[in-house]
């Protein structure tokens, strides 16, 4: 005979009015919308922490870095007003990969091949713009999607109120040609990367050449806050020494089996 069970706690009773879509994320009903699962990857959190550290150490922060037209040094700006930010929108951007002779046009190169150099840096591009009298803004932590290992970009003001800021430089093509000529006469060295305002965290970091990866367009001289030098979790395994191969085991040749001698006598039937 069945036994009737008494239930004292009302919370123990199944809620039959619950919408099924709240239990099954693949269902969608008029009552409850489809539940979209949230995926949080550990590398995303590492990337955010890394970007925040670089923004603080490289001197980019929330403002911009202006290049002093007299000294050529990169100086951090104060907080910009809305009017100043609107003026900056008229500036055009230049990335180092535009002048990289190791790259093809599909890999990000924009300047003519004969005016491109190896290991272009954003700081040298800013120096070239300064020498031409072009106002420039240096952004140390910004990177091109195809050149993430060489951080830095430069904003330049070519025209103001529709008129060229410098006579003879009417457009971006002409400016890139003049900058390419400057880069040709100012090749990148290990001392060049020390001119950036990295901050105290990079005082003991020495610039060094990095090995080039086969099939990858990249610099072998990069700024000190490059992911190639800071052991970023996404790139630190690129240059780890491969494990040594296991010792070769001497395999003895199999012994030859003795074959039975052939019977060379013919049997003649009578």
Swiss-Prot record:
It is found in: Cytoplasm. Fungal signal recognition particle consists of a 7S RNA molecule (scR1) and at least six protein subunits: SRP72, SRP68, SRP54, SEC65, SRP21 and SRP14. Signal-recognition-particle assembly has a crucial role in targeting secretory proteins to the rough endoplasmic reticulum membrane. It must be involved intimately in the translocation of a wide variety of protein substrates. Belongs to the SRP19 family. Residues 237-270 are annotated as: Disordered. This is Signal recognition particle SEC65 subunit. GO terms for biological process: SRP-dependent cotranslational protein targeting to membrane, signal sequence recognition.
